[in-house]
Amino acid sequence: MSTARLKINLDALAINWRNLDAKTNCETAAVVKANGYGLESGRVGKALAQAGARNFFVAIAEEGIALRRALGPGPGISVFAGHMEGDAKLLRDFQLTPMLNSLDQMLRHFESLPGHPFGVQLDSGMNRLGMEAAEWMAVRDIALDQNPVLLMSHLACSDEPGHGMNAYQLKNFIEMTEGLNIPRSLAATGGLLLGRDYHFDLCRPGIGLYGGAPYADALPVVELEVPVIQVRDLAPGESVGYGNTWIAQRDSKIATIAGGYADGLHRAFQRQGIMAYAGGTPCPVVGRISMDLITVDVTDLAEVPPYLSLMNETQTVDVLANAADTIGYEVLTSLGNRYARTYSA
């Protein structure tokens, strides 16, 4: 079998949610956008619901369909993108709650789905989504008359606890919402870890659930094992892969494994170098990562196993991300469709 195995530990996912929830004195929701950060939103959502999550967030209305089918009619599912043109039927049929981002969305929602639950997203300084303070003040009374279920905003720099932007956005959010008897939410994973001043009524962790930074105590949720297709011997001076970027300095043994950038194993991982693991033994990935293949120096192994591990407790999502000068979010959500996904609980 030449398919790589992506092992997803749903117990670790649930423990991460419970441990984050224990840091708050408010409700803890769960963000399962981008198909559950690449791990399949239905499976992830069910595990988180069993752990205790009662509210979930997705990016766009279409993502809510599979999640609602998996969760059934009870839990809340909110949509960050709000109420886009053509969304009314999806929002109604799948009981999705849009986080309205603008006056246009507000008018669209009130006209097409009167009485349907909604929240409002406010821009506290990130300048990405949400109503700015002046726009909010102009329509606030209209919105409040329709009974929003949540007022929310999003932090730009919460992964940097000492960044002044955090306090600035907190101040702005308080000024925009103070005195209103509506549940509020500001914190994702990073904001939750900043402390209870940022928690309000609901926290909505995402990446921390899946084992990623900035939640340093997160349990790893994913393991990736890639099958060995072929092993060959090289003499000193022979090269490996495109561009001859790696040249053997000694008698070497090279394993070619069945994964590549088409599977989300980016060429950029080679900027700082990554390892493939045979049990606990690291073996350097050498040469360029190509679309479907990766080459590994297994010279020092007594025996080459049928699979080598690229993601595990040692080489985590964030270790891979750092090697490519990116973030764990990008690594997780890039994991391709060719993997055989298995789930343990």
UniProtKB/Swiss-Prot annotation:
One Pfam family named in its UniProt record: Ala_racemase_C
Entry's EC annotation: 5.1.1.1
Binding locations of substrate: 128, 291
Cofactor: pyridoxal 5'-phosphate
Keyword Isomerase (UniProt): yes
Keywords, sorted A to Z: Isomerase, Pyridoxal phosphate
CDD domains (UniProt xref): PLPDE_III_AR
Single GO BP term: D-alanine biosynthetic process
Active site positions: 33, 242
Known catalytic reactions: L-alanine = D-alanine
Molecular function via GO: alanine racemase activity; pyridoxal phosphate binding
Biochemical pathway: Amino-acid biosynthesis; D-alanine biosynthesis; D-alanine from L-alanine: step 1/1
Residues found modified as N6-(pyridoxal phosphate)lysine: 33
GO cellular component: cytosol
Function: Catalyzes the interconversion of L-alanine and D-alanine. May also act on other amino acids.
NCBIfam families listed in its UniProt record: alr
Family: Belongs to the alanine racemase family.
Protein's recorded name: Alanine racemase
Gene field: alr
